[in-house]
Design a protein with these regions (language model features):
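Conserved beta-hairpin
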Residues: 50-67
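A short, internal acetyl-CoA/4′-phosphopantetheine-binding micro-motif in the GNAT/acyltransferase core
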Residues: 55, 71-85, 104-105
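Long, contiguous binding/interaction regions
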Residues: 64-67, 103, 114
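Conserved acetyl-CoA-binding loop-helix of GNAT-fold acetyltransferases
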Residues: 82-95, 109-117
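Conserved GNAT acetyl-CoA-binding A-motif
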Residues: 96-107
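Conserved catalytic-core motifs of GNAT/GCN5-like acyltransferases
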Residues: 103, 121-129
């Protein structure tokens, strides 16, 4: 598998929206999201340079980005989960920023493992009610 990060140009905005709203992926986020195409376009027009798309053999497999200027967010397509895509994205993306945080749900073990594998230090996990 050949992986690379590319800019999150307009051709990928709908991919990001659908991936974020995928019921399998919703469990990994703190908030449930219902995002319209119009909302996605508006958001990405302002924030597209804070996001990258991971291509695996040329196919979009996930995204990684920065929220609030310091909070890393990422999501992997269910078809590519467990194949190192999340680890690759965090490893490639995070050196771009001097300081970033990762907020991970206490029950999101897969994401915890990604960050710990890359040497991130656990501070605290919040429990979503």
């Amino acid at each position: 598998m050949k992986m690379k990060l590319v800019n999150c140009t307009e051709q990928y905005w709908e991919f990001v929206r659908k991936l974020r709203m995928n019921p399998i992926n919703q469990e990994g986020f703190f908030t449930y999201a219902e995002i319209t195409s119009e909302q996605q376009e508006s958001y990405m027009l302002k924030n597209q340079w804070d996001y990258k798309i991971c291509l695996v053999d040329g196919e979009p497999a996930g995204y990684v980005g920065l929220l609030k200027g310091h909070e890393i967010t990422y999501c992997v397509s269910p078809d590519f989960q467990g194949k190192g895509v999340g680890t690759f994205m965090i490893e490639e993306f995070s050196p771009r920023w001097a300081w970033v945080d990762a907020l991970v749900k206490v029950d999101n073990i897969a994401s915890q493992k990604v960050f710990e594998k890359l040497g991130w230090k656990k501070q605290i996990y919040y429990r979503n009610k």
